[in-house]
């Protein structure tokens, strides 16, 4: 995966061509009869997307996601509200453009020659490859040549259909597949791990995120090379919306916003460790329930799930953990640090968590105010691991090497240099295991992503089970209850033991469409 890197050569050429073609209408906000004017008159930017961990998601009713955040900032740039419509699959997205129900599609869509025949692309902002996936333990195909429609299913509107057709015509004449008109790629990947489907195809970023929650999903082979991802708008003679998008993305690049968004959503790395992820998720089921109340109790300024991820990275949630260097306990505190925090027993889980939070808060308070709010925690965690003085050195080294010392993306690239003599010999505080601090923060981010996604999945399953129970045992009137034998006691037994003990706070509906006003 190539991360959020805007293709500025492409933008520059396109901007020049647009400037020549549109010079009578520039500035784009100066005309009354154009798409931008219509959007501003309406007071809202209508964006259609799909529900994925990367593009658009919700936690506790609050929307987030790479495409959502970019779309929200673009709406702010235009001075209008953002209206998001969530569709079930890609075909429905393009229907919105065809029917005039959307101004833009922001859903991690791949640029290809077929799509640009009918729709206008925007700037490309990262790239993906299309990959065939299967379930660990099942047969792994090494080629597409013998796959049949009974084995391979893809989502409607998926860009890979064009690639499959080309491969069938040129290389694999026996290749066949089917399209499921009712399911998106995420749902098809779920079918694969549940054993309902042998294979499906999804993009490399979606697969990487899915594996954080479902490590049993594996990549069999690449179907395509890297393909650029972009937004799409209607193809017509009015290019004012394209001009506005170019202005917007250029401004985002110049002020560093794009780099921060890259780090936020794609900066956790794309390497996947099956064994480590599976071990972590087992611990979520078996160990976390006993510790969750403590994490929730002491997580004040950070999400309790992030605190849990920190503790897992430190000790794998083992209150008795001890390292050769003398650090001990759930949060692996040194003896001196524990004493300074008033901790009398480092192996007591509650004391250790309380002390770890206080120490992390101390690191957070030292991070300069010039660091963006949503990146301060990563600076603090690196300082938690290697000491704040070495974090100062890392920032100084970043500035000396023409990076931004307030950007975590820039600083983390320099952390490994703190253990290399040509660099640490010239720094104030000398040698540090910067490579370990780098890995420390990256691992915590991966555990946090897995934990959030896994808990969401569990709550979704509980919700679906409750809904199924309601369908199996519909409400009946007292009169009907007297007339017919009804398994009421069975209903109470199942409800109290399984379903009513779960009170889901995160609901993820994938039926039809949903509209959100922001």
Swiss-Prot record:
Residues annotated as the enzyme's active site: 314
Keyword Lyase attached: yes
SMART domains: PBPb
A matching Pfam family: SBP_bac_3
Bilayer disposition of the protein: Peripheral membrane protein
PROSITE patterns linked to this entry: TRANSGLYCOSYLASE
Record-level Gene Ontology MF annotations: peptidoglycan lytic transglycosylase activity
Residue span of region Non-LT domain: 22-269
EC number of the protein: 4.2.2.n1
Localization annotation: Cell outer membrane
PANTHER family according to UniProt: MEMBRANE-BOUND LYTIC MUREIN TRANSGLYCOSYLASE F
Entry note about domains: The N-terminal domain does not have lytic activity and probably modulates enzymatic activity. The C-terminal domain is the catalytic active domain.
Protein name per its UniProtKB record: Membrane-bound lytic murein transglycosylase F
């Amino acid at each position: 995966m190539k991360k959020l890197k805007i293709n500025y050569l492409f933008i520059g050429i396109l901007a020049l061509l647009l400037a020549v073609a549109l010079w009578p209408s520039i500035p784009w906000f100066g005309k009354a009869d154009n798409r931008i004017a219509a959007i501003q008159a309406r007071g809202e930017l209508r964006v259609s997307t799909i529900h994925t961990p990367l593009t658009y998601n919700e936690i506790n009713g609050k929307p987030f996601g790479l495409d959502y955040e970019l779309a929200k900032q673009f709406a702010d740039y235009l001075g209008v509200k953002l209206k998001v419509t969530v569709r079930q699959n890609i075909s429905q997205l393009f229907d919105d453009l065809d029917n005039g129900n959307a101004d833009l599609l922001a859903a991690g869509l791949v640029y290809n020659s077929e799509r640009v025949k009918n729709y206008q692309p925007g700037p490309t902002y990262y790239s993906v490859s299309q990959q065939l996936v299967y379930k660990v333990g099942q047969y792994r195909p090494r080629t597409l040549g013998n796959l049949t429609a009974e084995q391979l299913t893809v989502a409607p509107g998926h860009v890979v259909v064009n690639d499959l057709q080309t491969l069938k015509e040129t290389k694999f004449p026996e290749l066949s597949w089917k399209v499921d008109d009712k399911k998106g790629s995420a749902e098809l990947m779920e079918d694969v791990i549940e054993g309902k489907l042998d294979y499906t195809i999804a993009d490399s970023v979606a697969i990487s995120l899915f594996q954080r929650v479902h490590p049993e999903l594996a990549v069999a082979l690449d179907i395509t090379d890297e393909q650029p991802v972009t937004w799409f708008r209607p193809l017509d003679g009015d290019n004012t919306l394209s001009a506005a998008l170019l202005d917007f993305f250029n401004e985002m690049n110049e002020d560093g916003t794009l780099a921060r968004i890259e780090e936020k959503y794609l900066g956790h790395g794309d390497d996947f460790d099956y064994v480590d992820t599976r071990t972590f998720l087992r611990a979520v089921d078996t160990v976390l329930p006993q510790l969750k109340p403590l994490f929730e109790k002491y997580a004040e300024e950070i999400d309790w799930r992030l605190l849990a991820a920190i503790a897992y990275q430190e000790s794998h949630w083992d209150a008795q953990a001890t390292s050769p260097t003398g650090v001990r306990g759930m949060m692996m505190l040194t003896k001196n640090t524990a004493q300074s925090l008033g901790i009398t027993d480092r192996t007591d889980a509650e004391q250790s968590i309380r002390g770890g939070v206080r120490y992390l808060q101390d690191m957070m308070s030292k991070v300069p105010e010039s660091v963006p709010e949503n990146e301060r925690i990563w600076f603090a965690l690196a300082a938690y691991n290697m000491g704040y003085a070495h974090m100062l050195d890392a920032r100084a080294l970043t500035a000396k090497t023409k990076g931004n010392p307030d950007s975590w993306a820039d600083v983390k690239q320099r952390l490994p240099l703190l253990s290399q003599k040509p660099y640490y010999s010239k720094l104030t505080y000398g040698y540090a295991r910067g490579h370990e601090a780098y890995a420390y923060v990256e691992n915590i981010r991966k555990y946090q992503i897995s934990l959030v996604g896994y808990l969401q999945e569990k709550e979704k399953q509980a919700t679906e089970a409750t809904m199924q129970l309601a369908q199996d045992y519909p409400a009946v009137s007292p009169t009907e209850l007297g007339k017919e034998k009804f398994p009421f006691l069975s209903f109470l037994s199942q409800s109290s033991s399984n379903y009513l003990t779960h009170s889901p706070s995160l609901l993820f509906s994938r039926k039809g469409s949903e509209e959100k006003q922001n």
